[in-house]
């Protein structure tokens, strides 16, 4: 099972759908733990400190900050960049498939753009 965190701009319908379809999913929303307003490097640092793969729609800046952590030798558990133009159901299906078929450690240091 993957340990996930969604950034504050991640589609709430996707988050709700994930939780409805898999109630035991280990998913935290940053805004639910009082961490809204953090910049990208701080979000990635929190995700790394808590060993959580980041869910984001931010393909403009988040991947660059993620790879900067990797090249600096810092921990980066992974980032899933979900295209915000795909149907909500497709995003949910893809994320649940990754949760079922992969392990947390497989995504360390990687940025995955979804859908594939």
PLM segments and residue spans:
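Acidic, PIN/NYN-like endoribonuclease modules and their adjacent C-terminal/linker elements
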Residues: 2-25, 31-35, 41-44, 66-116
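Short, conserved beta-strand edge motifs with alternating hydrophobic and charged residues
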Residues: 28-30, 55-56
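Acidic, metal-binding active-site segment of PIN/NYN-like and related structure-specific nucleases
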Residues: 40, 48, 52-65
């Amino acid at each position: 099972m993957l340990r996930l965190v969604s950034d504050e701009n991640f589609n709430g319908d996707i988050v709700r759908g994930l939780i409805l379809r898999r109630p035991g999913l280990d998913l935290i929303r940053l805004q639910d733990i009082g961490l809204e307003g953090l910049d990208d490097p701080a979000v990635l640092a929190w995700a790394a400190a808590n060993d959580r793969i980041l869910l984001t729609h931010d393909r403009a800046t988040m991947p660059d900050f993620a790879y900067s952590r990797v090249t600096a030798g810092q921990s980066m558990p992974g980032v899933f960049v979900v295209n915000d133009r795909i149907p909500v159901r497709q995003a949910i299906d893809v994320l649940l498939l990754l949760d079922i078929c992969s392990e947390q450690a497989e995504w360390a240091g990687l940025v995955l753009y979804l859908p594939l």
